[in-house]
Amino acid sequence: SVGFKAGVKEYKLTYYTPEYETKDTDILAAFRVTPQPGVPPEEAGXAVAAESSTGTWTTVWTDGLTSLDRYKGRCYHIEPVPGEKDQYXXYVAYPLDLFEEGSVTNMFTSIVGNVFGFKALRALRLEDLRIPTAYIKTFQGPPHGIQVERDKLNKYGRPLLGCTIKPKLGLSAKNYGRAVYECLRGGLDFTKDDENVNSQPFMRWRDRFLFCAEAIYKSQAETGEIKGHYLNATAGTCEEMMKRAVFARELGVPIVMHDYLTGGFTANTSLAHYCRDNGLLLHIHRAMHAVIDRQKNHGMTFRVLRKALRLSGGDHIHAGTVVGKLEGERDITLGFVDLLRDDFVEKDRSRGIYFTQDWVSLPGVIPVASGGIHVWHMPALTEIFGDDSVLQFGGGTLGHPWGNAPGAVANRVALEACVLARNEGRDLAAEGNAIIREACKWSPELAAACEVWKEIKFEFKAVDTLDK
């Protein structure tokens, strides 16, 4: 018998296996690999598979104490990226045994934890993941999901309306609560803490929670509708975060909020479990996502962060607008939206979806369109996002010349007009402006909003685009 053979071995000899047939239980990953000059794509692909699973830079004698064939990641297919020089799409299959059940943290630590600093690669991007149903079933997922949220709020047949309170920092708790009340009274369903509103010297969290709860109950009594404010429970420690969520539940409010990337997946999953057990909806903000997902050749796509969130748990998540000030190409954004809401999503490379994904009845997440949008965008948003969405107008509500409540009225009237027109069979894409103009005739608040924002557009090309 041959003894242990020390030394450095090419990765592709062990980890590049084009003949491998993937299993239903494998986690599949699609990477965009940019090898260093002189490194063949097969070696680069195999290096990714090795470094994100069982491999290290040299053979080690302890390899003989386990079954590498059972546990190793395998690069099973490589193809050039269309229209790009020296970039390859590498597909890697990971056996399910490599991952702790119910832990997004462990899944990411394995798949993207170490390999992105690897010297043989100039750049690396995780484009998509196929999560096997066997693994999905180890997660709770979103605390409630779309249908349960509608039933809790008693709101059907239209998108929900939100507003981020601005200025995001600097208001006292009482003035903040006042702004919340005006927006909710005017016809919005939700108002929102901004992502960096936590507990600062000018407004401690407990004071904010109390004044916002007062605003919610007062506006509910006046309008006869259920209202909510996304109370941001994000904090410096998990214990403090949970303390804030518990206080929100004691106040009887319907929804709390978390910054899931800066807060971390472990904290987020704990909060999602608490929210399901205690009947709280959970709004998720994606602060920090563009650090990870905006560059086209390095990092990971928002598609992957989105799937991770559905596993970890959240009832809403920001999803780009297609028409506002923040990044989001239409096809890519719609691909994201389907992965959040639908139970089964077919592979469709034209929308950036590399794998067919079956969510096996894991609850859906409502996409939130937010960032630089106003009443003139309403027809496009209604058409693009459909009913199961939250349309969030911060400046588009608070920037109204007559104040917050009229700003809220303008948005609600514009939304109701668009939903009515759609239900009557009109074409929102073609007739959008006409629909809004007609509605202005019986809403002076909407007419004033249309006057202020008639010419505003944010016209820049998206950075993260699809490969044609």
From Swiss-Prot:
<feature type="site" description="Transition state stabilizer">
    <location>
        <position position="325"/>
    </location>
</feature>
<keyword id="KW-0120">Carbon dioxide fixation</keyword>
<feature type="binding site">
    <location>
        <position position="194"/>
    </location>
    <ligand>
        <name>Mg(2+)</name>
    </ligand>
</feature>
<feature type="active site" description="Proton acceptor">
    <location>
        <position position="285"/>
    </location>
</feature>
<keyword id="KW-0460">Magnesium</keyword>
<dbReference type="GO" id="GO:0016984">
    <property type="term" value="F:ribulose-bisphosphate carboxylase activity"/>
</dbReference>
<keyword id="KW-0113">Calvin cycle</keyword>
<comment type="similarity">
    <text>Belongs to the RuBisCO large chain family. Type I subfamily.</text>
</comment>
<feature type="binding site" description="in homodimeric partner">
    <location>
        <position position="114"/>
    </location>
    <ligand>
        <name>substrate</name>
    </ligand>
</feature>
<feature type="binding site">
    <location>
        <position position="195"/>
    </location>
    <ligand>
        <name>Mg(2+)</name>
    </ligand>
</feature>
<dbReference type="InterPro" id="IPR020878">
    <property type="entry name" value="RuBisCo_large_chain_AS"/>
</dbReference>
<dbReference type="InterPro" id="IPR020888">
    <property type="entry name" value="RuBisCO_lsuI"/>
</dbReference>
<feature type="active site" description="Proton acceptor">
    <location>
        <position position="166"/>
    </location>
</feature>
<keyword id="KW-0456">Lyase</keyword>
<feature type="binding site" description="via carbamate group">
    <location>
        <position position="192"/>
    </location>
    <ligand>
        <name>Mg(2+)</name>
    </ligand>
</feature>
<feature type="binding site">
    <location>
        <position position="164"/>
    </location>
    <ligand>
        <name>substrate</name>
    </ligand>
</feature>
<keyword id="KW-0150">Chloroplast</keyword>
<dbReference type="GO" id="GO:0000287">
    <property type="term" value="F:magnesium ion binding"/>
</dbReference>
<keyword id="KW-0602">Photosynthesis</keyword>
<dbReference type="Pfam" id="PF02788">
    <property type="entry name" value="RuBisCO_large_N"/>
</dbReference>
<dbReference type="InterPro" id="IPR017443">
    <property type="entry name" value="RuBisCO_lsu_fd_N"/>
</dbReference>
<feature type="binding site">
    <location>
        <position position="318"/>
    </location>
    <ligand>
        <name>substrate</name>
    </ligand>
</feature>
<feature type="binding site">
    <location>
        <position position="168"/>
    </location>
    <ligand>
        <name>substrate</name>
    </ligand>
</feature>
<comment type="subunit">
    <text>Heterohexadecamer of 8 large chains and 8 small chains; disulfide-linked. The disulfide link is formed within the large subunit homodimers.</text>
</comment>
<dbReference type="GO" id="GO:0009507">
    <property type="term" value="C:chloroplast"/>
</dbReference>
<dbReference type="InterPro" id="IPR036376">
    <property type="entry name" value="RuBisCO_lsu_C_sf"/>
</dbReference>
<protein>
    <recommendedName>
        <fullName>Ribulose bisphosphate carboxylase large chain</fullName>
        <ecNumber>4.1.1.39</ecNumber>
    </recommendedName>
</protein>
<keyword id="KW-0479">Metal-binding</keyword>
<keyword id="KW-0503">Monooxygenase</keyword>
<dbReference type="GO" id="GO:0019253">
    <property type="term" value="P:reductive pentose-phosphate cycle"/>
</dbReference>
<dbReference type="GO" id="GO:0009853">
    <property type="term" value="P:photorespiration"/>
</dbReference>
<dbReference type="InterPro" id="IPR000685">
    <property type="entry name" value="RuBisCO_lsu_C"/>
</dbReference>
<keyword id="KW-0601">Photorespiration</keyword>
<feature type="modified residue" description="N6-carboxylysine">
    <location>
        <position position="192"/>
    </location>
</feature>
<dbReference type="GO" id="GO:0004497">
    <property type="term" value="F:monooxygenase activity"/>
</dbReference>
<keyword id="KW-0560">Oxidoreductase</keyword>
<feature type="modified residue" description="N6,N6,N6-trimethyllysine">
    <location>
        <position position="5"/>
    </location>
</feature>
<dbReference type="InterPro" id="IPR033966">
    <property type="entry name" value="RuBisCO"/>
</dbReference>
<feature type="binding site">
    <location>
        <position position="286"/>
    </location>
    <ligand>
        <name>substrate</name>
    </ligand>
</feature>
<keyword id="KW-1015">Disulfide bond</keyword>
<dbReference type="InterPro" id="IPR036422">
    <property type="entry name" value="RuBisCO_lsu_N_sf"/>
</dbReference>
<keyword id="KW-0934">Plastid</keyword>
